[in-house]
Swiss-Prot record:
Superkingdom field: Bacteria
Keyword hit for Repressor: no
Keywords of the record: Cytoplasm, NAD, Oxidoreductase, Pyridoxine biosynthesis
SUPFAM superfamilies: Glyceraldehyde-3-phosphate dehydrogenase-like, C-terminal domain, NAD(P)-binding Rossmann-fold domains
Signal peptide residues on this chain, from the entry's feature table: none
Source species: Salmonella gallinarum (strain 287/91 / NCTC 13346)
List of residues binding NAD(+): 12-13, 81, 318
Similarity remark: Belongs to the glyceraldehyde-3-phosphate dehydrogenase family. Epd subfamily.
Chief place of localization: cytoplasm
UniProt protein name: D-erythrose-4-phosphate dehydrogenase
UniProt cross-references to PANTHER family, sorted A to Z: GLYCERALDEHYDE-3-PHOSPHATE DEHYDROGENASE 2
Recorded metabolic or biological pathway in which this protein acts: Cofactor biosynthesis; pyridoxine 5'-phosphate biosynthesis; pyridoxine 5'-phosphate from D-erythrose 4-phosphate: step 1/5
Biological processes, Gene Ontology terms: glucose metabolic process; pyridoxal phosphate biosynthetic process; pyridoxine biosynthetic process
Length: 348
């Protein structure tokens, strides 16, 4: 069965989802039938074809009126501001990928379903009222047909959760701290300008800027046993893509750095192949641009202090890796079937 998807919001993640779909060769599994975006069709086509971070798109892209052509495929363009007005029923949409970054609660998901979609996948952390939050590679096998409104968590959650799981399963995590070193985002300023967050009033290209993060909450959403045992901070740095995460955990069992690396490398080659990668090459952030993995462990930076404090550095392409996980989760949601009885919903 080919899953019919619609994309709501054609920004960084929405466009990368389309690119990843075509580059990964999954067009027999997923078809994009519509994109809803307030910007005009000319701008949508141009930014899909030309991308500063990911280069030129290999497929021919053009637009005519309210249609986007990618190769021989035709995608309907919509410019609806109100979710209730979206023609998902008419278009036979199986899953809506909501990539706006604005919508994320159950009410928004129900609006997509009322418009005719069978399921909804948010490209960002949602409220506690959603049916499930999925980190692909860790808990997607817990999805059920009645899970209709789902979050794909965040790029940083997808990056760090597999590593936390591996370390906890092997050594037993007591507590941890996380520092996210994240590329600049489009909620920052090119030059100094007003923003409700005074730090984000400052030019993104000129400073390392601390920002709020809910990553600790994202960790405990997947692993409730770590409630009040993880803390996280985040800074934005003057690069336009790729993120590094500094993870420090205290563990119950004594361990050496070489053993940690052996564990993570084995997982990358085995159970977490395609999700986690491992490297000991002397690489920098640009080298991970366009990497489809959720997490790339930098083995050269693993440290252990006092046999119980582990520090690791984990990289990710916060756009490309996450866009690929959106596709993975979409297929996982479709694979368990579509149960339309909302009263049967159970939470994951």
């Amino acid at each position: 069965m080919t899953v019919r998807i619609a994309i709501n919001g054609f920004g960084r993640i929405g466009r990368n989802v389309v690119r990843a779909l075509y580059e990964s060769g999954r067009r027999a599994e997923i078809t994009v039938v519509a994109i809803n975006e307030l910007a005009d069709a000319a701008g949508m086509a141009h930014l899909l074809k030309y991308d500063t971070s990911h280069g030129r798109f290999a497929w021919e892209v053009r637009h005519e009126r309210e249609q986007l052509f990618v190769g021989d495929d035709v995608i309907r363009i919509l410019h609806e501001r109100t979710l209730a007005d979206l023609p998902w029923r008419e278009l036979g949409v199986d899953v809506v990928l909501d990539c706006t970054g604005v919508y994320g609660n159950r009410e928004h998901g129900e609006a997509h379903i009322a418009a005719g979609a069978k399921k909804v996948l948010f490209s960002h952390p949602g409220s506690n009222g959603l049916d499930a939050t999925v980190v692909f590679g860790v808990n997607q096998n817990e999805l059920r047909a009645e899970h209709r409104i789902v979050s794909n968590a965040s790029c940083t959650t997808n990056c760090i959760i597999p590593v936390i799981k591996l370390l906890d399963d092997a050594y037993g995590i007591e507590s941890g701290t996380v520092t996210t070193i994240h590329s600049a985002m489009n909620d920052q300023q090119v030059i100094d300008a007003y923003h409700s967050d005074l730090r984000r009033t400052r030019a993104a290209s000129q400073s390392i800027i601390p920002v709020d993060t809910k990553l600790a909450a994202g960790i405990t959403r997947i692993f409730p046993q770590f409630n009040d045992r993880f803390e996280a901070i985040a800074v934005r740095v003057p690069t336009i893509n790729v993120t590094a995460i500094d993870l420090s955990v205290t563990v119950k069992k004594p361990v050496k750095a070489s053993e940690v690396n052996q564990l993570l490398q084995k997982a990358a080659q085995g159970a977490f192949h395609g999700i986690v990668d491992y490297t000991e090459s002397p690489l920098v952030s640009i080298d991970f641009n366009h990497d489809p993995h959720s997490a790339i462990v930098d083995g050269t930076q693993t440290r252990v202090s006092g046999a119980h404090l582990i520090k690791t550095l984990v990289w990710c392409d916060n756009e490309w890796g996450f866009a690929n996980r959106m596709l993975d989760t979409t297929l996982a949601m479709a694979a368990v079937g579509f149960r339309l009885d909302a009263s049967a919903s159970t939470k994951l």
